[in-house]
Amino acid sequence: MKNKIIILAFLFFVSVNSFSQKFYLGDQLSPKSTQFKLLGISSSTGVHTYKYIGAITDTYFYNRRVGEIIVGFKKGIVVTTIYNLIPEKGDVGVPQSTLDLVQSAIPFPLAYSNGMYGANIDNTSISLIRTTNAITFNKDRIMFMTSVKNSLLRN
């Protein structure tokens, strides 16, 4: 029995380190300076926002190449993830194939308003938008963001 626990712990450790560029809301993680660069700290929520600077081994996310990954932490827990996806030549807005993949992964339909697709599920927000701004490092990107409800972050 102890051997099984040791083997499972080892496999978990290897899998987390091998695919360390995937981040999920609620994960516990201590950002290390070799993998993360601090971008800022929110004065209203206390969320520490980092750019992931480690190796991106899973280069595709929802059918598009990953450009940049931004992760927000509060008290060592992931509370925000932003995957800036690189549009393919010919993409207009958020591509339908990406929308279909996201939609198949969530239980409620994505709403559309002013170029943004999104859903609020319990205490989680999901949004997709094609944009060029500071969060995308002023590059044309399809921004996929998940976040814990803002009112919870203020507590």
Model-found features: residue ranges?
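Short, Lys/Arg-enriched, disordered terminal segments
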Residues: 1-5, 155
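Sec/Tat signal peptide C-region and signal peptidase I cleavage site
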Residues: 16-20
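Short solvent-exposed loop/turn micro-motifs enriched in small/polar/acidic residues
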Residues: 62-65, 112
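Hydrophobic/aromatic beta-strand elements that line small-molecule binding cavities or substrate pockets
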Residues: 67-72, 130-133
